Amino acid sequence: MAENASDATTAATNLRLSQAVWETVANDGIEATTVRRVAERAECTTGLLMHHFGTRTAMLAHAREVLYKRTAARANNAENLGLNPRETLFEVLSGTLTLDTERQQEARVWMGFAAAALPDSDIRKLHVSGNRDWLQRITRLVAACELAASPYAAQGFAVRLIALTEGLATLSSLDPETYSADIQRSMLTAEIDSLLGAQHS
């Protein structure tokens, strides 16, 4: 019983620290995500935080991993809805649009890491790896729509769609009135329809 209680306490602490890192990055930005600020949010000592993560870079990398997992889980759920290939492609891609508060927060984290990745090679490697995994997923979904005659062409379509959705997520984070949820959905629908039409014309 004592061991189970200890495990539960450890799990609760890990979750609290993870949430504190995520919320600090999302609300305050990468540059402001210091060990002290995260510790204050987690209501713990800086020593406990550093014992858990080791370094500030590792702490930031954890937040990026959380973003990967959240995005992947949403995409997996979309793929398991039993929709047709085109609808599945739309649902997965719309998971990265800022259609609700949760995804708005994720977009802010993504932008923060994109900026931090420029001068930091470790963060850049992690960021690029995650983005390439996403490109592989979207390329596979595009191919399932029979949009392309070759893997190269399928990837080209995927790059266009990702550029659109990531661009919309960024712009809407800065100007949500102009780039509303309805506008984002409409533009993604139009781009997918354009690709389908171009392939079958």
For each feature predicted by the language model, list its residue ranges.
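Hydrophobic/aromatic-rich alpha-helical bundle segments in the mid-to-C-terminal region
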Residues: D122-V128, R132, A144-S201
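Hydrophobic/aromatic residues within well-ordered alpha-helical segments
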Residues: T13, R56, A63, L67, ...
